[in-house]
Protein backbone atom coordinates (compact mmCIF):
# COMPACT_ATOMS: atom_id res chain seq x y z
CA UNK A 1 0.00 0.00 0.00
CA UNK A 2 1.06 3.49 -0.67
CA UNK A 3 1.38 5.52 2.42
CA UNK A 4 2.27 9.09 2.77
CA UNK A 5 5.21 9.98 4.98
CA UNK A 6 2.78 10.85 7.66
CA UNK A 7 1.51 7.23 7.69
CA UNK A 8 -1.83 8.03 6.13
CA UNK A 9 -3.14 6.16 3.05
CA UNK A 10 -2.94 8.11 -0.18
CA UNK A 11 -5.99 8.85 -2.26
CA UNK A 12 -4.79 6.38 -4.93
CA UNK A 13 -4.54 3.61 -2.35
CA UNK A 14 -8.02 4.34 -0.99
CA UNK A 15 -9.42 4.29 -4.55
CA UNK A 16 -7.73 0.94 -5.30
CA UNK A 17 -9.11 -0.52 -2.07
CA UNK A 18 -12.59 0.65 -2.98
CA UNK A 19 -12.33 -0.87 -6.49
CA UNK A 20 -11.01 -4.14 -5.05
CA UNK A 21 -13.91 -4.35 -2.60
CA UNK A 22 -16.40 -3.82 -5.45
CA UNK A 23 -14.74 -6.56 -7.54
CA UNK A 24 -14.90 -8.97 -4.60
CA UNK A 25 -18.57 -8.11 -3.98
CA UNK A 26 -19.50 -8.63 -7.65
CA UNK A 27 -17.66 -11.95 -7.77
CA UNK A 28 -19.36 -13.14 -4.59
CA UNK A 29 -22.77 -12.13 -5.91
CA UNK A 30 -22.19 -13.90 -9.23
CA UNK A 31 -21.38 -17.30 -7.69
CA UNK A 32 -25.07 -18.25 -7.35
CA UNK A 33 -25.65 -17.16 -10.96
CA UNK A 34 -22.84 -19.37 -12.21
CA UNK A 35 -24.20 -22.27 -10.17
CA UNK A 36 -27.68 -21.71 -11.59
CA UNK A 37 -26.35 -21.63 -15.15
CA UNK A 38 -24.38 -24.81 -14.63
CA UNK A 39 -27.56 -26.82 -14.03
CA UNK A 40 -28.63 -28.62 -17.23
CA UNK A 41 -31.66 -27.27 -19.01
CA UNK A 42 -34.28 -29.91 -19.74
CA UNK A 43 -35.46 -29.64 -23.33
CA UNK A 44 -38.39 -31.63 -24.68
CA UNK A 45 -37.54 -34.37 -27.11
CA UNK A 46 -39.69 -35.49 -29.99
CA UNK A 47 -39.91 -38.46 -32.27
CA UNK A 48 -38.86 -37.84 -35.85
CA UNK A 49 -39.43 -39.66 -39.12
CA UNK A 50 -36.01 -40.80 -40.36
CA UNK A 51 -35.34 -40.34 -44.07
CA UNK A 52 -34.63 -44.07 -44.50
CA UNK A 53 -38.09 -44.94 -43.15
CA UNK A 54 -39.70 -42.25 -45.31
CA UNK A 55 -38.05 -43.92 -48.32
CA UNK A 56 -39.41 -47.34 -47.31
CA UNK A 57 -42.92 -45.91 -46.97
CA UNK A 58 -42.64 -44.23 -50.37
CA UNK A 59 -41.24 -47.41 -51.96
CA UNK A 60 -44.20 -49.44 -50.70
CA UNK A 61 -46.58 -46.80 -52.06
CA UNK A 62 -44.81 -46.85 -55.44
CA UNK A 63 -45.10 -50.64 -55.63
CA UNK A 64 -48.84 -50.39 -54.99
CA UNK A 65 -49.20 -47.64 -57.62
CA UNK A 66 -47.37 -49.77 -60.17
CA UNK A 67 -49.54 -52.79 -59.34
CA UNK A 68 -52.80 -50.88 -59.93
CA UNK A 69 -51.33 -49.34 -62.38
CA UNK A 70 -51.72 -45.67 -61.49
CA UNK A 71 -48.76 -43.32 -61.89
CA UNK A 72 -48.77 -40.08 -59.97
CA UNK A 73 -47.01 -38.25 -57.17
CA UNK A 74 -46.19 -39.47 -53.67
CA UNK A 75 -45.00 -37.08 -50.98
CA UNK A 76 -43.78 -37.68 -47.44
CA UNK A 77 -43.66 -34.79 -44.96
CA UNK A 78 -42.37 -34.45 -41.41
CA UNK A 79 -44.43 -33.52 -38.34
CA UNK A 80 -44.24 -29.84 -39.28
CA UNK A 81 -45.58 -30.53 -42.78
CA UNK A 82 -42.22 -29.95 -44.47
CA UNK A 83 -41.44 -32.22 -47.42
CA UNK A 84 -38.93 -34.98 -46.68
CA UNK A 85 -39.25 -36.50 -50.13
CA UNK A 86 -41.49 -36.27 -53.15
CA UNK A 87 -41.59 -38.66 -56.08
CA UNK A 88 -43.20 -37.93 -59.42
CA UNK A 89 -43.66 -41.12 -61.39
CA UNK A 90 -42.92 -41.09 -65.14
CA UNK A 91 -46.52 -40.96 -66.34
CA UNK A 92 -48.08 -38.91 -63.55
CA UNK A 93 -51.80 -38.53 -64.28
CA UNK A 94 -52.16 -34.78 -63.66
CA UNK A 95 -49.77 -31.87 -63.44
CA UNK A 96 -51.66 -30.73 -60.36
CA UNK A 97 -50.57 -33.91 -58.57
CA UNK A 98 -47.17 -32.35 -57.81
CA UNK A 99 -48.93 -29.80 -55.65
CA UNK A 100 -51.78 -31.94 -54.37
CA UNK A 101 -49.70 -34.80 -52.94
CA UNK A 102 -47.58 -32.74 -50.51
CA UNK A 103 -50.61 -30.65 -49.52
CA UNK A 104 -52.60 -33.81 -48.73
CA UNK A 105 -49.72 -35.06 -46.58
CA UNK A 106 -49.43 -31.66 -44.85
CA UNK A 107 -53.19 -31.51 -44.22
CA UNK A 108 -53.15 -35.00 -42.69
CA UNK A 109 -50.38 -33.90 -40.33
CA UNK A 110 -51.96 -30.60 -39.35
CA UNK A 111 -55.36 -32.16 -38.63
CA UNK A 112 -53.81 -35.42 -37.35
CA UNK A 113 -56.26 -37.46 -39.39
CA UNK A 114 -56.82 -38.91 -42.80
CA UNK A 115 -57.81 -36.47 -45.51
CA UNK A 116 -60.56 -38.96 -46.42
CA UNK A 117 -62.05 -38.13 -43.00
CA UNK A 118 -61.70 -34.43 -43.77
CA UNK A 119 -63.32 -34.88 -47.19
CA UNK A 120 -66.25 -36.71 -45.57
CA UNK A 121 -66.62 -33.92 -43.00
CA UNK A 122 -66.70 -31.27 -45.73
CA UNK A 123 -69.27 -33.28 -47.72
CA UNK A 124 -71.37 -33.89 -44.62
CA UNK A 125 -71.57 -32.31 -41.19
CA UNK A 126 -68.74 -29.73 -41.53
CA UNK A 127 -68.96 -27.96 -44.91
CA UNK A 128 -67.37 -24.86 -43.35
CA UNK A 129 -64.14 -26.86 -42.99
CA UNK A 130 -63.50 -26.14 -46.67
CA UNK A 131 -62.77 -22.53 -45.68
CA UNK A 132 -59.66 -23.56 -43.69
CA UNK A 133 -56.94 -21.78 -45.67
CA UNK A 134 -54.17 -23.82 -47.24
CA UNK A 135 -55.51 -27.31 -46.62
CA UNK A 136 -56.54 -30.01 -49.09
CA UNK A 137 -59.64 -31.95 -48.09
CA UNK A 138 -59.31 -34.77 -50.64
CA UNK A 139 -58.64 -38.48 -50.16
CA UNK A 140 -55.02 -39.59 -50.30
CA UNK A 141 -53.43 -38.00 -47.24
CA UNK A 142 -52.64 -40.02 -44.12
CA UNK A 143 -50.82 -39.13 -40.90
CA UNK A 144 -47.78 -41.26 -40.09
CA UNK A 145 -48.00 -42.29 -36.43
CA UNK A 146 -45.30 -44.45 -34.85
CA UNK A 147 -45.56 -45.65 -31.24
CA UNK A 148 -48.32 -43.12 -30.64
CA UNK A 149 -46.27 -40.19 -31.97
CA UNK A 150 -47.24 -38.19 -35.03
CA UNK A 151 -44.01 -38.07 -37.04
CA UNK A 152 -45.22 -37.09 -40.50
CA UNK A 153 -47.67 -37.71 -43.29
CA UNK A 154 -48.00 -39.30 -46.70
CA UNK A 155 -49.87 -37.73 -49.57
CA UNK A 156 -50.75 -39.41 -52.86
CA UNK A 157 -52.26 -38.00 -56.02
CA UNK A 158 -52.79 -40.44 -58.89
CA UNK A 159 -55.85 -41.08 -61.09
CA UNK A 160 -58.77 -41.55 -58.65
CA UNK A 161 -59.48 -40.69 -55.02
CA UNK A 162 -59.85 -44.37 -54.10
CA UNK A 163 -56.49 -45.19 -55.67
CA UNK A 164 -54.94 -42.24 -53.82
CA UNK A 165 -56.20 -43.64 -50.54
CA UNK A 166 -55.22 -47.26 -51.32
CA UNK A 167 -51.67 -46.25 -52.28
CA UNK A 168 -51.24 -44.12 -49.15
CA UNK A 169 -52.46 -47.05 -47.02
CA UNK A 170 -49.97 -49.37 -48.76
CA UNK A 171 -47.19 -46.99 -47.76
CA UNK A 172 -48.37 -47.00 -44.15
CA UNK A 173 -48.40 -50.81 -44.09
CA UNK A 174 -44.61 -50.63 -43.73
CA UNK A 175 -44.98 -49.33 -40.16
CA UNK A 176 -47.92 -51.46 -39.03
Describe each model-derived feature in a short phrase.
Residues 1-14:
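N-terminal secretory signal peptides that target proteins for export/translocation
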Residues 5-7, 18, 152:
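Intrinsic structural disorder/low-complexity segments
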Residues 15-17, 114:
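Secondary-structure junction/capping motif
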Residues 17-32:
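Bacterial N-terminal signal peptides
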Residues 36-176:
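Flexible, solvent-exposed loop/hinge segments and secondary-structure transition points
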Amino acid sequence: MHQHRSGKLTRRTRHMSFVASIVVAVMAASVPLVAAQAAPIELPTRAVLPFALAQKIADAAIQKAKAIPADGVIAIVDDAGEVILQIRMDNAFMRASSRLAPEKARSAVMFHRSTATLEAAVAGPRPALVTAPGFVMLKGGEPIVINGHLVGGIGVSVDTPDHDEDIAQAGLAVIK
